[in-house]
Amino acid sequence: MSLKKIIFALGLIIALTAATLIFFTHGLNYIGVNVALLGLGAVLMRQSAYFSDNFYQHASPQSFYPTAGRMIPWFAWLAAVLVIYGLYISFAIAPTDFQQGEAYRIIFVHVPAAWMSMVIYLAMAFWAGVGLALNSKLSAMMAQALAPTGAIFTLLALVTGSLWGKPMWGTYWVWDARLTSELILLFLYLGFMALQASIDDPRKADRAGALLALVGAVNIPIIYFSVKWWNTLHQGSSINMGVAPKMAATMFEGMILMALAFWMYTIAVALIRVRCIILERERNAGWVKELSVKEIA
């Protein structure tokens, strides 16, 4: 059996296992999440399997550029479908919270945005580290492409959290451990982008940015565990692995769908941005000049 088939099978097994666990824990109430897990697991693992067999072919900017262009529409459409379905579940189907009323619905944006702010930073640090260790130009470009989207989601998490905090805490901001560490995350994103922009040599900029990204990764566990390590106003995790969610099934489904929509959006936008970075950095390469001639013609 080829490596591609093995990875594809593993992807389906993981997706099926996750869907089965949710089904037996919560029954048919989570059928939407089950379908999303199975479908996205199959699609994404199929793409991962494809790249595993063609890694060296697609590791160069020249080969990755057209491949990214073919992938963008798929992730963009997935993001659009998931966000429409997620918003419908979140604002039309999910019940009103008995304590917070309608104000709680901001969690359907706030919580997925907070998740994405951390996940994207880890992905950015990973690609930056790969670029630093293997001297891979494409990996460094991927890290650079992820940073702006990560900063946007971090800012979105902070703003929506402040709007949610006003009716809950009586103020828009407190120097809480969770809020402060999330604000530091925003500064890390901005610092990463500013540092790279301040260095003219792209290779030196990549190395400097990678060091900052890797050092800053220590902030991610601080954000996640801050509510456990310190006495904070911020509530605990909305979802705990191995523990059934306390929220209504439709609330959980809406939150997961919005998180998946944000993730698909991130991939689509990052691919668009990395194509622009490739063209900028490789503008003197022969294949880019040929591409320009073809587009003009």
List where the protein language model places each region.
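Alpha-helical transmembrane segments of multi-pass membrane proteins
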Residues: T17-T25, V81-D97
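Hydrophobic alpha-helical membrane-insertion segments
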Residues: G209-F225
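Extramembrane terminal tails and long inter-domain/linker segments of multi-pass membrane proteins
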Residues: M1-S2, S48-G69, V274-A297
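Short aromatic-rich membrane-water interface segments that cap or initiate transmembrane helices
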Residues: E102-M116, T171-L183, N240-I256
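Membrane-interface transmembrane-helix boundary segments in multi-pass integral membrane proteins
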Residues: G27-I31, V111, N231-M264, W287-A297
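Hydrophobic cores of alpha-helical transmembrane segments in multi-pass inner/ER membrane proteins
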Residues: L12-I13, V35-Y50, P112-W127, I184-Q196, ...
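Membrane-interface helix-loop-helix modules in multi-pass inner-membrane proteins
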Residues: L3, I22-A36, S48, T149-Q196
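N-terminal membrane topogenic signal
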Residues: M1-G11, F64-L78
